[in-house]
Amino acid sequence: MADQVSPDQGLVIELGAGTGNVTQALLDAGLSPDHLIVVERDPAFYVLLKQRFPFLKILRGDAARLRRVLAPLGISSAVAVVSSLPLLSMPKPIRQRIVEESFAVLAERGTFIQYTYGAFSPLRRRQSGLKGEVAERVWRNFPPAAVWRFRRRGSAAHVA
């Protein structure tokens, strides 16, 4: 999943970091801590992330209210949103709100990257005006996992 983000392109927002495995992979891939903001809703994971990554900007908040969560930092644009949220298990209105909030903070040519299980897209691409593709499959997982990359239709990639 970290391979989908180019470390020198700009600000990356991670949603639902949990214990920080993807966070660590992003840092290991060369993403500067100054270019990563982590948003975590769960209080226990938030505390764990603050302890594990004291040098990162970690915000406690709901991805469905992403603009409000980022507002105190004055952040209004990112080149990528990386999500490990279980979108497929969420009610459609919440899933839709998270995607809308993510694209509201993405630069015009920004990318929404979603890790998910199963063979199907976690987002309805045609209805949402997005172009989606499987960027990577992880066959070692059971069930197999997929990394999906979504952009607005007609935009080129800013991330690898």
Positions of predicted regions on the chain:
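Conserved SAM-binding loop of SAM-dependent methyltransferases across substrates and taxa
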Residues: 19-31
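A short glycine-rich, Lys/Arg-flanked "PGG" loop and its adjoining helix->strand segment in the class I
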Residues: 96-108
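Core SAM-dependent methyltransferase catalytic element
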Residues: 137-160
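Conserved beta-strand signature within the Rossmann-like core of class I S-adenosyl-L-methionine
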Residues: 108-116
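Conserved class I S-adenosyl-L-methionine
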Residues: 9-18
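Conserved alpha-helix/loop element of class I SAM-dependent methyltransferases that forms part
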Residues: 1-8
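Conserved SAM-binding loop
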Residues: 49-50
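Conserved SAM/SAH-binding beta-strand->alpha-helix loop
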Residues: 42, 62
